């Protein structure tokens, strides 16, 4: 989302692929570190540089870091792209939808295969995200909030205050919703290599 809002290329790596050591946390189980760059090749170069096991971050993955630029010149022939036209157009700026569809058709012309998919309704998942993120953010900022409340902006104050209202049962239910969402998306990825959709519903700011 930050990259889309700025009109640049962003890459959100697998959780744990990049160390979060030294980063001001928002939500422990949701935070990712990734490059914001000019183009896809730059994203690969940056990820190659920052990925890998970090002894200072026990959640960082021990898996070997592959060559992030391998195959970048091979084209997209045979790539299976999942597309839900209703999903990318509902409540989305028409110009943005048209731009996404144009990009997909370009990839199709280069040999990619477009596969019709049905994305799940994300409204319930976004509600669960709010429960998880706000409560984890409160935990991450417990040393400075609310003791230094005035150092926080009004929006983030409200976000943390909402997190303080979350019960253990509500957090557990939200985590179950997250697991269900992950399962649904994993099933979709059994048939496609990528899902093509806008990162947000409006053009860059």
Predicted features along the sequence, with ranges:
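FAD-binding core of FAD-dependent oxidoreductases
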Residues: 1-10
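A short helix-breaking turn/cap at a secondary-structure junction
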Residues: 9-98, 103, 121
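Short, Asp-centered acidic motifs that coordinate Mg2+ and/or phosphate
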Residues: 34, 193-195
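Short helix-loop capping/hinge segments that flank enzyme active sites or metal/cofactor-binding pockets
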Residues: 70-85, 132-186, 198-203
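Short glycine-rich, flexible loops that bind phosphorylated cofactors or substrates
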Residues: 90, 203-204
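Acyltransferase
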Residues: 94-118, 141-147, 171-192
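Short glycine/threonine-rich loop-to-helix capping motif typified by GTGT followed
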Residues: 94-96, 125-135, 205
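Short connector loops at secondary-structure junctions
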Residues: 112-129, 160-161
């Amino acid at each position: 989302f930050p990259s889309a809002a700025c009109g640049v290329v962003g890459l959100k790596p697998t959780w744990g692929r990049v160390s979060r050591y030294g980063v001001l946390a928002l939500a422990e189980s949701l935070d990712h570190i990734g490059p914001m760059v000019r183009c896809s090749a730059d994203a690969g170069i940056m990820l190659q540089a920052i990925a890998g096991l970090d002894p200072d971050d026990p959640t960082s993955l021990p898996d070997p870091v592959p060559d992030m630029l391998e195959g970048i010149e091979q084209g997209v022939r045979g790539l299976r792209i999942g597309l839900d036209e209703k999903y990318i157009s509902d409540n989305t700026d028409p110009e943005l939808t048209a731009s996404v569809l144009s990009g997909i058709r370009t990839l199709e012309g280069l040999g990619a295969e477009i596969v019709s998919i049905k994305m799940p309704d994300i409204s319930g998942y976004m509600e669960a995200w709010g429960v998880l993120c706000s409560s984890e953010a409160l935990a991450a900022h417990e040393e400075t909030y609310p003791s230094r409340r005035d150092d926080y902006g009004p929006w983030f104050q409200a976000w943390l205050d909402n997190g303080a209202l979350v019960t253990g049962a509500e957090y557990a239910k939200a985590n179950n919703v997250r697991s269900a969402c992950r399962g649904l998306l994993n099933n979709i990825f059994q048939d496609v290599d990528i899902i093509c959709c806008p990162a947000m519903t409006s053009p860059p700011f």
